[in-house]
């Protein structure tokens, strides 16, 4: 099953270092946008080692398909967690996604089974990103913020 979009909202947590320079903001070319913001009211806390993120959980076909399409900014401490009813091969693409992301595939035990860097795509024929192992969850974070690796367990 292909998802029509990938999205992520970046989260800032007390354990994430703040950038010294606003030009380091992820997904932003404007100093007007904060790197770290309060999480949305419906955000769920998620930890990977010492890092904490606040993620928007999407668990319906419609919300998974929308993902982070057309969002032009994500705070560094936020992300999006795609939740599926079972563990299976999961394929994603970046159609109309404007922010570079890291896609993190998690198995049913919430262990990281794959991590791939994904670039924005504004054309019709976007590359497909397929996890190397079946996954029940796929986490999207701003590209480069994750300090975890394959084999780490995510807490949520």
Which functions belong to the PLM regions below?
Residues 1-4:
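Sec-dependent signal peptide recognition
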Residues 8-10:
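C-terminal motif of bacterial Sec signal peptides marking the signal peptidase cleavage site
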Residues 12-156:
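Compact, glycine-rich, soluble single-domain proteins
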């Amino acid at each position: 099953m292909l998802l029509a979009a990938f999205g992520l909202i970046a989260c800032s947590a007390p354990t994430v270092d703040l950038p010294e320079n606003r030009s380091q903001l992820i997904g932003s070319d404007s100093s007007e946008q904060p790197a770290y913001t309060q999480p949305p009211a419906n955000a769920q806390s998620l930890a990977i080692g010492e890092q904490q993120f606040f993620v928007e959980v999407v668990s319906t076909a419609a919300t998974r398909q929308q993902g982070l399409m057309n969002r032009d900014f994500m705070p560094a401490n936020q992300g999006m967690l795609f939740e599926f009813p079972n563990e299976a091969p999961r394929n994603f693409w970046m159609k109309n996604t404007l922010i570079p992301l890291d896609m993190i595939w998690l198995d049913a035990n919430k262990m990281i089974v794959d991590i791939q860097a994904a670039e924005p795509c504004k054309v019709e024929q976007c590359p497909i990103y397929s996890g190397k192992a079946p996954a029940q969850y796929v986490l999207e974070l701003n590209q480069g913020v994750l300090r975890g690796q394959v084999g780490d367990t995510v807490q949520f």
